[in-house]
């Protein structure tokens, strides 16, 4: 997450911006540390609010977030200090006194940006909400109280300072409330598109970056989060790499349709180029200064349009997790 994206290779916001799109990103950047060659302001993002620091991104009451607004005239990404947090220690009993909850702040900025979009100019938004990863923490509000009553006998977790996660009571209630909070965020995004009259011309995708984890006291077994799939985050079993992918495009994508097409996130660049009408994007965006440069992705636009016969497929799919020397290859009817 701290390692910068390679500046020699184009990323999706840069392509969208070059083709007339207003670009916004709200949440976790994970594409380079502060001051690196790959921060949102340098990679095609017009407006950003959220985490650039990977360390802070594991906490919901961080010391600071980052923001950038090209229209406002910002010259670079800057820090936004969480004044209601910094007077209290990051680990220990004082942490519970922090008040600036990052998830709500990020969502508020995302909605504000979305409400400023219109039919007159295309827009590309990436809302990388971090809920429910990885710290189990949120305001002690009615939502959390509801789940505390639901789980009468709940699990506690003692905390782990080296991993920066504080002790947690009611871990199941915390997790369930965080999922419900995320669900409410998604509902507000969809409702905003409907109210703005943008739903029929906006593709919305809801997905995740990996399977469930056990960090911070999370208990995926209790919630049966991956059903019958084996494995967790940081593993190459299906439980670690097979994730939800839900798409809505009113009037274009048929409702209540499922697909068993295997694909990967690198297929989204050509897919978004198809959606945006960007033609010949490999030739246009390959770095001609590099001896070897290419795009791995295959557009899944035909599948989104329920045109399975036109859908090209990968001869194989490959995953690896270097920290544990895991490799997986999938070919054919597996």
Summary of predicted features, one role per range:
Residues 1-25, 34-35, 40-47, 57, ...:
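Active-site segment of extracytoplasmic enzymes that catalyze sulfate/phosphate-ester chemistry
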Residues 48-49, 246:
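Short, well-ordered beta-strand core segments
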Residues 12, 28, 268, 300:
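Short active-site alpha-helical segment characteristic of glycosyltransferases
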């Amino acid at each position: 997450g701290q390692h910068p994206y390679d500046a020699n290779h184009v990323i999706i916001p840069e392509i969208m911006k070059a083709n007339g799109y207003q670009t916004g990103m709200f949440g976790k950047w994970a594409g380079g540390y502060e001051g690196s060659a790959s921060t949102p302001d340098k990679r095609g993002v017009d407006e950003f609010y959220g985490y650039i620091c990977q360390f802070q991104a594991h906490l919901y009451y961080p010391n600071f977030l980052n923001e950038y607004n090209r229209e406002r005239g910002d010259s670079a990404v800057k820090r936004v200090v969480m004044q209601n947090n910094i007077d209290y220690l990051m680990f220990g009993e004082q942490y519970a006194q922090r008040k600036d909850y990052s998830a709500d702040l990020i969502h508020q900025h995302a909605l504000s940006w979305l409400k400023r979009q219109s039919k007159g100019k295309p827009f590309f938004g990436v809302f990388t909400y971090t809920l429910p990863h990885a710290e189990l923490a949120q305001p002690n509000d009615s939502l959390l109280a509801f789940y505390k009553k639901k789980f009468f006998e709940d699990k506690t977790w003692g905390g782990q300072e080296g991993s920066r996660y504080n002790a947690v009571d009611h871990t199941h209630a915390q997790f369930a409330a965080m999922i419900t909070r995320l669900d409410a965020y998604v509902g507000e995004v969809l409702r905003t598109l409907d109210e703005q009259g943008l739903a029929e011309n906006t593709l919305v995708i809801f997905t995740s970056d990996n399977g469930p984890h056990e960090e911070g006291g999370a208990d995926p077994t209790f919630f049966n989060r991956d059903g019958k799939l084996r494995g967790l985050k940081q593993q190459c079993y299906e439980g670690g790499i097979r994730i939800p992918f839900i798409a809505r495009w009113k009037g274009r994508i048929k409702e209540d349709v499922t697909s068993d097409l295997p694909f990967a996130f690198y297929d989204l660049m050509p897919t978004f180029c198809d959606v945006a009408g960007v033609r010949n994007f490999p030739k246009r965006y390959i770095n001609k200064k590099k001896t070897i440069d290419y795009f791995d992705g295959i557009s899944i636009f035909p599948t989104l349009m329920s045109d399975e016969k036109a859908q090209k497929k990968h001869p194989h799919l490959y995953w690896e997790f270097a920290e544990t020397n895991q490799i997986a290859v999938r070919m054919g009817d597996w």
